[in-house]
Amino acid sequence: MMLQIPEVLTKAQVAECRAILDAGPWVDGNVTSGFQAAMAKNNEQLPQDSAEARHVGAIIVQALEANPLFVSAALPRTILSPMFNRYGEGMGFRDHVDNAIRRDPVTGQRLRTDLSCTLFLAEPEDYDGGELVVNDLYGDHVVKLAAGDAILYPSTSLHHVTTVTRGRRTASFFWIQSLIRDDARRSLLLDMDVAIQQLSRKVERDDEAILSLTGVYHNLLRQWAEV
C-alpha cells in the first residue's frame, strides 16, 4: 500500500517548522549512516537529539495523531521520532531499502519498521529533481508533493531520491511500527474503514448493515493486531 496524505501540516505550520529547522545545526547525513547507506547517501541531516529536531518532531507527531487518514492507513503502534534531511544541488540518495529495526534516539525504544513516511517541507517549485522514487510490483512511483503533504509506503520497498539540480529539498522522514504487521491485511482494513465511512454518510448511523460491517472490522483488527 502506498498512500498520499494531504495537508498533514498547514502552510502556517510548514512556515513555522521551516523557520526552526533552517536555523538548526545541519551536518553531513552520513554521520548517522551504516556502511551500506553511506555508499548511497549524499545529503544533510539535522542531529536527532537537537532541540530543533525535537521541537518540530513533536509538532509533526501531534499532527499525525490527529489525522484520520494517517491513523486509518497506518494503524500506528509506535511512531519513530521524526528525522529531518535536506538535499542541495548535486545531492541525492541512491537505491536502498530501509533497515528492518530502528532505535528511537529520543526514547531509546526499538521498533520494527513496517511503514516509511516522508513529509515534504519544501514546495515542488522551489527545487528541481529531488523526487522520491518508490519501486513495487507495479513499477516505479515518482513522488514530489506540496509542502505539508506526506507519502506513506511499505518499508520493504526499494526507493531512492533523485539528484537535486536546483534549489533545496527539505523533508521529514520517519518510520511506523503498525498494529498490523502484514501490509495486505493493513490495506484490507483501510479499504473496509473507508467503505464504512462512505456508507455511513448515505444511511442512518444505526443502520444494521453499518453496525455489522463495523463489527467485522473490529473483529479482524482484534484477530490480527499485535499490541
Curated annotation (Swiss-Prot):
GO MF annotation list: 2-oxoglutarate-dependent dioxygenase activity; iron ion binding; L-ascorbic acid binding
EC number of this enzyme: 1.14.11.-
Gene Ontology BP, a term: intracellular iron ion homeostasis
Lineage top rank: taxon: Bacteria
Residue numbers binding Fe cation: 96, 98, 159
Domain Fe2OG dioxygenase: 78-178
The protein, known as: PKHD-type hydroxylase CC_0027
Cofactor binding: number and manner: Binds 1 Fe(2+) ion per subunit.
Cofactor: Fe(2+); L-ascorbate
Enzyme's top EC category: oxidoreductase
Binding site for 2-oxoglutarate: 169
S-S bridge residues: none
PANTHER family linked: PKHD-TYPE HYDROXYLASE YBIX (PTHR41536:SF1)
Keyword annotations: Dioxygenase, Iron, Metal-binding, Oxidoreductase, Vitamin C
